[in-house]
Amino acid sequence: FFETNIHSRSYSHIIRNIYNVPKDVFNTIHDTKEIVDMASSVGRYYDELHKVNCRKELGQDVNEKEHIKAIYMALHASYALEAFRFMVSFATSLAMVENKIFIGNGNIISLILQDELLHKGWTAYLINQVVKEDSRFAQVKSECEAEVYQLYLDVIREEKEWADYLFKMGPVIGLNATVLKDFVDYTAVSALKEIGIRYNSPAPKTTPIPWFNKHVDTSKKQTALQENESTNYVIGVMTDSIDYEELPTI
Protein backbone atom coordinates (compact mmCIF):
# COMPACT_ATOMS: atom_id res chain seq x y z
CA PHE A 1 0.00 0.00 0.00
CA PHE A 2 2.91 2.35 0.69
CA GLU A 3 4.34 1.89 -2.82
CA THR A 4 0.88 2.12 -4.37
CA ASN A 5 0.35 5.44 -2.62
CA ILE A 6 3.70 6.72 -3.94
CA HIS A 7 2.82 5.59 -7.46
CA SER A 8 -0.58 7.27 -7.29
CA ARG A 9 0.93 10.54 -6.09
CA SER A 10 3.63 10.34 -8.75
CA TYR A 11 1.12 9.88 -11.58
CA SER A 12 -0.94 12.74 -10.15
CA HIS A 13 2.19 14.91 -10.14
CA ILE A 14 2.89 14.08 -13.79
CA ILE A 15 -0.64 14.94 -14.90
CA ARG A 16 -0.66 18.18 -12.90
CA ASN A 17 2.55 19.23 -14.64
CA ILE A 18 1.12 18.60 -18.10
CA TYR A 19 -2.43 19.95 -17.92
CA ASN A 20 -3.65 23.33 -16.71
CA VAL A 21 -6.84 21.76 -15.36
CA PRO A 22 -5.86 18.20 -14.38
CA LYS A 23 -9.27 17.36 -12.92
CA ASP A 24 -10.67 17.31 -16.46
CA VAL A 25 -8.31 14.43 -17.24
CA PHE A 26 -9.01 12.57 -13.99
CA ASN A 27 -12.76 12.90 -14.55
CA THR A 28 -12.61 11.28 -18.00
CA ILE A 29 -10.69 8.17 -16.92
CA HIS A 30 -13.83 6.22 -16.01
CA ASP A 31 -15.47 7.33 -19.25
CA THR A 32 -12.76 5.72 -21.37
CA LYS A 33 -14.13 2.32 -22.40
CA GLU A 34 -10.70 0.81 -23.05
CA ILE A 35 -9.55 1.61 -19.50
CA VAL A 36 -12.77 0.35 -17.89
CA ASP A 37 -12.64 -2.92 -19.87
CA MET A 38 -9.03 -3.59 -18.86
CA ALA A 39 -9.80 -2.97 -15.20
CA SER A 40 -12.90 -5.17 -15.09
CA SER A 41 -11.36 -8.17 -16.86
CA VAL A 42 -8.77 -8.66 -14.11
CA GLY A 43 -10.73 -7.09 -11.27
CA ARG A 44 -13.37 -9.81 -11.34
CA TYR A 45 -10.92 -12.31 -9.83
CA TYR A 46 -10.34 -10.01 -6.87
CA ASP A 47 -14.10 -9.51 -6.57
CA GLU A 48 -14.65 -13.26 -6.46
CA LEU A 49 -12.04 -13.76 -3.74
CA HIS A 50 -13.50 -10.84 -1.77
CA LYS A 51 -16.98 -12.41 -1.89
CA VAL A 52 -15.67 -15.76 -0.65
CA ASN A 53 -13.69 -14.08 2.13
CA CYS A 54 -16.76 -12.11 3.23
CA ARG A 55 -18.91 -15.23 3.34
CA LYS A 56 -16.31 -16.94 5.48
CA GLU A 57 -16.06 -13.93 7.83
CA LEU A 58 -19.85 -14.00 8.24
CA GLY A 59 -19.67 -17.63 9.34
CA GLN A 60 -21.29 -19.00 6.20
CA ASP A 61 -20.28 -22.35 4.77
CA VAL A 62 -17.44 -21.94 2.28
CA ASN A 63 -16.20 -24.80 0.17
CA GLU A 64 -12.45 -25.10 0.82
CA LYS A 65 -11.67 -25.95 -2.79
CA GLU A 66 -13.68 -22.95 -3.98
CA HIS A 67 -11.69 -20.73 -1.61
CA ILE A 68 -8.33 -22.17 -2.72
CA LYS A 69 -9.26 -21.63 -6.37
CA ALA A 70 -10.30 -18.03 -5.70
CA ILE A 71 -6.95 -17.34 -4.01
CA TYR A 72 -5.03 -19.05 -6.83
CA MET A 73 -6.84 -17.14 -9.58
CA ALA A 74 -6.37 -13.84 -7.74
CA LEU A 75 -2.62 -14.54 -7.57
CA HIS A 76 -2.56 -15.05 -11.33
CA ALA A 77 -4.61 -11.88 -11.82
CA SER A 78 -1.97 -10.02 -9.80
CA TYR A 79 0.81 -11.52 -11.90
CA ALA A 80 -1.01 -10.56 -15.10
CA LEU A 81 -1.18 -6.98 -13.83
CA GLU A 82 2.48 -6.81 -12.88
CA ALA A 83 3.88 -8.68 -15.89
CA PHE A 84 1.69 -7.39 -18.73
CA ARG A 85 -0.93 -4.80 -17.92
CA PHE A 86 1.29 -1.72 -17.71
CA MET A 87 4.05 -2.63 -20.18
CA VAL A 88 2.56 -0.91 -23.23
CA SER A 89 2.00 2.30 -21.27
CA PHE A 90 5.48 2.12 -19.74
CA ALA A 91 7.09 1.66 -23.15
CA THR A 92 5.05 4.50 -24.66
CA SER A 93 5.94 6.91 -21.85
CA LEU A 94 9.62 5.98 -21.97
CA ALA A 95 9.66 6.40 -25.77
CA MET A 96 9.11 10.10 -25.11
CA VAL A 97 12.23 10.14 -22.93
CA GLU A 98 14.15 8.55 -25.78
CA ASN A 99 12.98 11.49 -27.91
CA LYS A 100 14.08 13.99 -25.21
CA ILE A 101 10.49 14.81 -24.25
CA PHE A 102 9.15 14.78 -20.67
CA ILE A 103 12.49 13.51 -19.35
CA GLY A 104 11.65 14.32 -15.73
CA ASN A 105 8.38 12.43 -15.96
CA GLY A 106 10.20 9.54 -17.60
CA ASN A 107 12.59 9.28 -14.67
CA ILE A 108 9.66 8.94 -12.28
CA ILE A 109 8.06 6.32 -14.52
CA SER A 110 11.35 4.37 -14.64
CA LEU A 111 11.24 4.12 -10.85
CA ILE A 112 7.63 2.93 -10.90
CA LEU A 113 8.55 0.36 -13.58
CA GLN A 114 11.28 -1.04 -11.35
CA ASP A 115 8.80 -1.35 -8.47
CA GLU A 116 6.33 -3.20 -10.69
CA LEU A 117 9.03 -5.65 -11.80
CA LEU A 118 9.83 -6.34 -8.15
CA HIS A 119 6.14 -7.03 -7.53
CA LYS A 120 6.18 -9.35 -10.55
CA GLY A 121 9.05 -11.34 -9.06
CA TRP A 122 7.37 -11.64 -5.67
CA THR A 123 4.07 -12.75 -7.19
CA ALA A 124 5.80 -15.35 -9.38
CA TYR A 125 7.52 -16.71 -6.26
CA LEU A 126 4.19 -16.97 -4.43
CA ILE A 127 2.49 -18.75 -7.34
CA ASN A 128 5.31 -21.28 -7.66
CA GLN A 129 5.69 -21.75 -3.91
CA VAL A 130 2.06 -22.41 -2.95
CA VAL A 131 1.89 -25.17 -5.55
CA LYS A 132 5.08 -26.76 -4.17
CA GLU A 133 4.10 -26.53 -0.52
CA ASP A 134 0.35 -27.20 -0.58
CA SER A 135 -1.18 -30.18 -2.37
CA ARG A 136 -4.56 -28.39 -2.48
CA PHE A 137 -3.08 -25.65 -4.64
CA ALA A 138 -1.30 -28.26 -6.78
CA GLN A 139 -4.63 -29.92 -7.48
CA VAL A 140 -6.32 -26.62 -8.31
CA LYS A 141 -3.42 -25.79 -10.63
CA SER A 142 -3.89 -28.98 -12.65
CA GLU A 143 -7.65 -28.44 -12.88
CA CYS A 144 -7.46 -24.74 -13.84
CA GLU A 145 -4.65 -24.74 -16.41
CA ALA A 146 -6.91 -23.79 -19.31
CA GLU A 147 -8.69 -21.07 -17.30
CA VAL A 148 -5.39 -19.59 -16.11
CA TYR A 149 -3.94 -19.57 -19.62
CA GLN A 150 -7.08 -17.89 -20.95
CA LEU A 151 -6.72 -15.20 -18.26
CA TYR A 152 -3.28 -14.35 -19.63
CA LEU A 153 -4.42 -14.50 -23.25
CA ASP A 154 -7.20 -12.03 -22.44
CA VAL A 155 -4.79 -9.61 -20.75
CA ILE A 156 -2.30 -9.90 -23.62
CA ARG A 157 -5.07 -9.26 -26.17
CA GLU A 158 -6.25 -6.21 -24.21
CA GLU A 159 -2.72 -4.83 -24.04
CA LYS A 160 -2.46 -5.10 -27.82
CA GLU A 161 -5.81 -3.35 -28.20
CA TRP A 162 -4.52 -0.64 -25.85
CA ALA A 163 -1.50 -0.21 -28.12
CA ASP A 164 -3.85 0.36 -31.07
CA TYR A 165 -5.83 2.86 -29.00
CA LEU A 166 -2.74 4.81 -27.91
CA PHE A 167 -1.43 5.11 -31.47
CA LYS A 168 -4.73 5.66 -33.28
CA MET A 169 -3.50 9.15 -34.23
CA GLY A 170 -0.18 7.85 -35.58
CA PRO A 171 3.27 6.73 -34.32
CA VAL A 172 5.98 8.52 -32.38
CA ILE A 173 9.61 8.36 -33.46
CA GLY A 174 10.90 4.85 -32.81
CA LEU A 175 7.60 3.34 -31.67
CA ASN A 176 4.25 2.33 -33.12
CA ALA A 177 1.40 -0.07 -32.35
CA THR A 178 2.94 -2.96 -34.31
CA VAL A 179 6.25 -2.75 -32.43
CA LEU A 180 4.39 -2.55 -29.13
CA LYS A 181 2.31 -5.64 -29.90
CA ASP A 182 5.48 -7.55 -30.76
CA PHE A 183 6.91 -6.32 -27.46
CA VAL A 184 3.90 -7.74 -25.59
CA ASP A 185 4.45 -11.14 -27.23
CA TYR A 186 8.17 -11.00 -26.49
CA THR A 187 7.48 -10.17 -22.84
CA ALA A 188 4.89 -12.95 -22.59
CA VAL A 189 7.38 -15.72 -23.37
CA SER A 190 9.71 -15.08 -20.43
CA ALA A 191 7.00 -13.86 -18.02
CA LEU A 192 4.87 -16.98 -18.43
CA LYS A 193 7.91 -19.27 -18.40
CA GLU A 194 8.72 -17.85 -14.96
CA ILE A 195 5.53 -19.43 -13.60
CA GLY A 196 5.78 -22.66 -15.58
CA ILE A 197 3.50 -21.76 -18.49
CA ARG A 198 4.43 -22.04 -22.16
CA TYR A 199 3.31 -19.19 -24.41
CA ASN A 200 2.02 -20.84 -27.58
CA SER A 201 1.59 -17.77 -29.80
CA PRO A 202 4.33 -16.56 -32.18
CA ALA A 203 6.77 -14.15 -30.53
CA PRO A 204 10.01 -12.36 -31.51
CA LYS A 205 13.26 -14.00 -30.37
CA THR A 206 14.85 -10.65 -29.51
CA THR A 207 13.30 -7.58 -27.94
CA PRO A 208 11.64 -5.20 -30.41
CA ILE A 209 12.45 -2.30 -28.05
CA PRO A 210 16.17 -2.62 -27.10
CA TRP A 211 16.32 0.74 -25.30
CA PHE A 212 13.64 -0.43 -22.84
CA ASN A 213 16.25 -2.48 -20.95
CA LYS A 214 18.20 0.54 -19.76
CA HIS A 215 15.08 1.81 -18.00
CA VAL A 216 14.74 -1.55 -16.27
CA ASP A 217 18.38 -1.50 -15.14
CA THR A 218 19.16 2.11 -14.28
CA SER A 219 22.84 1.30 -13.77
CA LYS A 220 23.03 1.37 -17.59
CA LYS A 221 21.92 5.02 -17.63
CA GLN A 222 24.78 7.48 -17.35
CA THR A 223 23.57 11.01 -16.69
CA ALA A 224 25.26 13.72 -14.67
CA LEU A 225 22.94 15.31 -12.12
CA GLN A 226 23.45 18.78 -13.60
CA GLU A 227 22.22 17.43 -16.96
CA ASN A 228 18.99 16.02 -15.61
CA GLU A 229 16.68 16.24 -12.64
CA SER A 230 16.98 13.91 -9.66
CA THR A 231 15.01 10.67 -9.91
CA ASN A 232 13.71 10.96 -6.36
CA TYR A 233 9.93 10.95 -6.14
CA VAL A 234 8.83 14.58 -6.13
CA ILE A 235 5.32 16.00 -5.92
CA GLY A 236 3.83 19.45 -5.69
CA VAL A 237 6.62 21.40 -7.38
CA MET A 238 4.33 22.79 -10.07
CA THR A 239 1.24 24.97 -9.85
CA ASP A 240 -1.32 25.95 -12.45
CA SER A 241 -2.39 29.10 -10.62
CA ILE A 242 -0.29 32.27 -10.40
CA ASP A 243 -1.14 35.93 -10.03
CA TYR A 244 0.05 38.37 -12.67
CA GLU A 245 1.61 40.50 -9.91
CA GLU A 246 3.88 37.61 -8.91
CA LEU A 247 5.66 37.64 -12.26
CA PRO A 248 8.96 39.52 -12.36
CA THR A 249 9.21 42.70 -14.41
CA ILE A 250 11.44 42.53 -17.48
Identify the residue ranges that each predicted region occupies.
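Non-heme di-metal
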Residues: F1-I250
